[in-house]
């Protein structure tokens, strides 16, 4: 699945996002509608183990939380060309009443880090879990010969504050690690 939702008995709505595919933004919008209709103002956005996907999906999802024009990510070409700023479309439907926690771990990579980093740096939500993977490179396939190609890094992703995702990943505000015992017993700390 692309995502799962659950309204817990304690009133917290959990949205688990597994990837950033072409259909993810529409499914995310429907999940947010479900969240609003639940009457809760507490949302857990779980991107643990999410390897990423399309940048456009991450920008669209961030747009539900950010005013128009706010930077979601910066594509930095290392001085070879002007940086490209990817900005919120400004759906911004939540305002100040939203209580958002974003769950991350070493399996949160690429578009997961872009979404989590943007929401964190714009003070929309706090990061909880483990340090993320650090996959912040933009790659392009260059044809070589005989049907082979070479994948070349052409740029790197930066958070809205200009921090390199590739260098450090994202460090959570609150570190919570999942132990082997937690996994074996089906517990989610």
Which residues make up each language-model segment?
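Short acidic, Pro/Gly- and aromatic-enriched capping/linker segments at domain boundaries
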Residues: 146-155
């Amino acid at each position: 699945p692309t995502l799962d939702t659950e309204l817990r008995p304690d009133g917290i709505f959990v949205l688990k996002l597994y990837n950033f595919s072409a259909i993810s933004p529409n499914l995310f919008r429907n999940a947010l509608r479900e969240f609003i209709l639940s009457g809760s103002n507490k949302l857990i956005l779980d991107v643990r183990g999410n390897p990423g996907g399309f940048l456009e999906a991450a920008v669209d999802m961030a747009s539900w939380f950010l005013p128009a024009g706010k930077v979601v990510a910066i594509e930095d070409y290392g001085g070879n060309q002007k940086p490209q700023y990817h900005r919120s479309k400004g759906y911004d439907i939540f305002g100040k009443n939203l209580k958002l926690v974003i769950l991350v771990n070493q399996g949160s990579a690429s578009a997961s880090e872009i979404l989590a980093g943007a929401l964190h740096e714009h003070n929309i939500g706090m990061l909880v879990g483990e340090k993320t993977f650090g996959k912040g490179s933009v790659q392009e396939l260059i044809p070589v010969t005989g049907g082979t190609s070479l994948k070349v890094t052409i740029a790197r992703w930066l958070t809205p504050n200009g921090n390199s995702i590739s260098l450090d990943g994202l460090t959570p505000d609150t570190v919570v690690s999942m132990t082997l015992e937690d996994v074996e017993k089906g517990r989610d700390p």
